[in-house]
């Protein structure tokens, strides 16, 4: 073994190794997975990232490393894991296999899963860093001696009773609703009575207004009737005066005509029925009412 190591470290072997690396054109991995359009190249870059991840995980198992080196290595491994996920999505877009569904889980050298959830995990000696263990400790016991319940434990007690689907079975809700129902019925009855009183008050006010209007109309009709009677009396007086004058003038003629009437026995008969004064008054009163009715209805 010592002889082989000496051969590897010899000047000629190192020269040949350097010459071989210079002859090869090293390809750099694209910064973004979308820049690669070949499925073969995408698979190659994914395998390269896997090699770097395994190399980093084996290196981070060394407990002799200082804290800063361990943190840098752990950050670099998480970065490579995220980059591997980008290349796996790109391979799936190019028509390749779904490596995310087929790939096995990552384990430490001890065969344990790394601590952490989501996109950041702690590998190897990073678990023993200060402050990391406290993040993943079990919840402490409360003052009553019981462990602090998680959200999943709380959801176990959520059932139909929690949502109130079986509140009617104990009968307490019916008693409360019965009291409230009685109160609601009383309130509705009082409101109905109040509405009826208001309607009755409105109807009485309308009836009183109609009575006032009718009384005003009757008073006006009586005044008009009195005026008509006064006019009729004046006309009758004028007619009486004229008749007296005519009677004095016609007395002489009547005496002369009486003899002829006695001889001829003329009988006068009216073929047209003339209305009386009471009928004329009623007709005029009806016309006056009709005019007042039209006037109030228009207003």
Swiss-Prot record:
Residue spans of biased composition, Acidic residues class: 229-238
UniProt keyword Nucleus, yes or no: yes
InterPro entries per record: Helix_hairpin_bin_sf, Isy1, Isy1_sf
Key word Hydrolase present: no
SUPFAM superfamilies xref list: ISY1 domain-like
Pfam families for this protein: Isy1 (PF06246)
Principal location: nucleus
Record field: transmembrane: none
A cellular-component GO term for this protein: catalytic step 2 spliceosome
Stretch list, region Disordered: 223-252
Function: May play a role in pre-mRNA splicing.
Quaternary structure (record): Identified in the spliceosome.
Name of the protein in question: Pre-mRNA-splicing factor ISY1 homolog
Organism: Dictyostelium discoideum (Social amoeba)
Recorded name of the encoding gene: isy1
